């Protein structure tokens, strides 16, 4: 009798081994090997066999250029993030924490497309049809061309998508679907990977724009194999505190446009709506307080006015704390060391806390000057005029470097009635903002 052979596969990188391994030798993942059944082994072996006919390569100069056809998602902020709209045949992955509004946003998108007489399918494995209908009624999303399907069996969903000429499809969520051909539970890495691959083929062969909702892990990444993010055309993350109105949509991958844009939404009674006057959500118009400084950051092509808040308090014992919300803690430590060295401010005996209002995360160094100004304001208990903004990157030798795309930042200040700007060099274009030059960090003390 022939001995039964086993084959184990890593669920992260696909590495195969004839025996179970605790740690993958290729990607170093722990406890990631599962045993393949006979059908899966046959498929894997078939893929490794040489093809009977090899496709001939084509010169890139001979290939006809085809423009990517895009259409509006009916949500202006989502169109900005996607680079002008939804691409036909695009596969989009949307992740975010529970309750942030992923299903609400895509239900609004599906309803908007259906309102334009486009047939849209919304597949839900988490909610019943009556629950979706109740939510759609509350959001005013009832449309004749919006079709609902409550199903988790992938072959049934696939047959439904192939039987009708759908313009777009929403899968809510990928972790609830399962295929009987794969001997693992719904939401497992094998199930998610194989079903996503099938969705990718459907999107490309039938020109259907497909949105996939994905759960996230406790670390904040989308649950499932890393290959999932490589298979899709765009990866979008929905951020925001469910207890607050503001939501931020970020693009971390986009084959059809830039990845630096963000979309701003507000959770209202009628659901998620595109935010108007976005900058007003991130700074206070009240009387100035100690520890607050204004700056302007660029998110893609959009300039946003932000309020940096600092709290400096005397440390009673132990090592002082340095905590930052929305700002890089390592960069904060660097700026504190710079203040101690250049301005001889004894922050080594003080706790320093930084917060960026509105819950947005700063990724560019052009906000360094505002962080330093807010720390000095809190340390000296002096208020800074809330019509003054600080713009500039601070180097390790104490010099202040010019912020890129300065004219766009000053234009945003003009729109909201700001009067003064502290920066290393005056702008090349005329502006109503009164600009004061400060090329070294020591000159900031003059404004305290």
From Swiss-Prot:
EC number(s) stated in the UniProt entry for this protein: 3.6.4.-
Cellular component annotations (GO), alphabetically ordered: cytosol
Ranges where the record places region Lon-protease-like: 351-448
Keyword DNA repair carried by entry: yes
Protein's GO biological process: recombinational repair
Sequence positions that bind ATP: 96-103
Keyword Zinc: yes
Keywords of the record: ATP-binding, DNA damage, DNA repair, DNA-binding, Hydrolase, Metal-binding, Nucleotide-binding, Stress response, Zinc, Zinc-finger
Family: Belongs to the RecA family. RadA subfamily.
Function according to Swiss-Prot or TrEMBL: DNA-dependent ATPase involved in processing of recombination intermediates, plays a role in repairing DNA breaks. Stimulates the branch migration of RecA-mediated strand transfer reactions, allowing the 3' invading strand to extend heteroduplex DNA faster. Binds ssDNA in the presence of ADP but not other nucleotides, has ATPase activity that is stimulated by ssDNA and various branched DNA structures, but inhibited by SSB. Does not have RecA's homology-searching function.
Cross-referenced HAMAP family: RadA_bact
Protein known as: DNA repair protein RadA
Protein source organism: Helicobacter pylori (strain J99 / ATCC 700824) (Campylobacter pylori J99)
């Amino acid at each position: 009798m022939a001995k039964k052979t086993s084959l184990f596969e890593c669920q992260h990188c696909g590495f195969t081994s004839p025996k179970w391994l605790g740690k993958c030798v290729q990607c170093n993942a722990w406890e990631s090997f599962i045993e393949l059944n006979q059908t899966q082994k046959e498929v894997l072996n078939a893929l490794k066999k040489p093809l009977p006919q090899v496709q001939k390569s084509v010169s890139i100069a001979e290939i006809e250029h085809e423009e990517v056809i895009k259409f509006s998602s009916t949500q202006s902020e989502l169109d900005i993030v996607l680079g002008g709209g939804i691409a036909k045949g695009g596969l989009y992955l949307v992740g975010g924490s529970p309750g942030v509004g992923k299903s609400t946003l895509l239900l609004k998108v599906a309803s908007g497309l259906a309102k334009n007489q486009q047939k849209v399918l919304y597949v839900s494995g988490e909610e019943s049809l009556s629950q979706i209908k109740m939510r759609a009624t509350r959001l005013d999303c009832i449309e004749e061309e919006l079709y609902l399907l409550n199903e988790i069996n992938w072959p049934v969903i696939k047959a439904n998508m192939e039987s009708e000429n759908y313009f777009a499809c929403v899968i809510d969520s990928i972790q609830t679907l399962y295929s009987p051909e794969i001997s693992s539970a719904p939401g497992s890495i094998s199930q998610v990977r194989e079903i996503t691959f099938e969705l990718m083929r459907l999107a490309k062969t039938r020109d259907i724009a497909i949105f996939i909702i994905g759960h996230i892990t406790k670390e904040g990444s989308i649950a499932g194999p890393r290959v999932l993010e490589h298979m899709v055309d765009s990866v979008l993350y929905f951020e925001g505190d469910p207890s607050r109105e503001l939501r931020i949509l970020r693009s971390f991958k986009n084959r059809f446009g830039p990845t630096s844009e963000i979309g701003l939404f507000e959770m209202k009674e009628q659901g998620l709506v595109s935010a108007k006057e976005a900058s007003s959500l991130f700074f206070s118009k009240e009387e100035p307080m100690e520890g607050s400084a204004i700056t302007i950051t660029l998110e893609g092509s959009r300039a946003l006015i932000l309020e940096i808040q600092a709290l400096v308090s005397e440390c009673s014992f132990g090592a002082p704390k340095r905590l930052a919300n929305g700002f890089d803690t390592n960069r904060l430590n660097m700026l504190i060391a710079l203040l101690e060295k250049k301005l001889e401010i004894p922050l080594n005996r003080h706790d320093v806390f930084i917060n960026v209002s509105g819950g947005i995360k700063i990724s560019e160094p052009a906000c360094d000057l505002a962080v330093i100004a807010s720390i000095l304001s809190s340390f000296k208990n002096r208020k800074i005029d809330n019509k003054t903004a600080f713009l500039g990157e601070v180097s390790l030798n104490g010099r202040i470097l010019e912020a890129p795309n300065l004219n766009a930042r000053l234009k945003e200040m003009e729109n909201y009635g700001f009067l003064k700007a502290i920066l290393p060099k005056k702008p090349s274009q005329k502006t109503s903002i009164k600009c004061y030059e400060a090329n070294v960090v020591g000159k900031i003390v003059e404004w305290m």
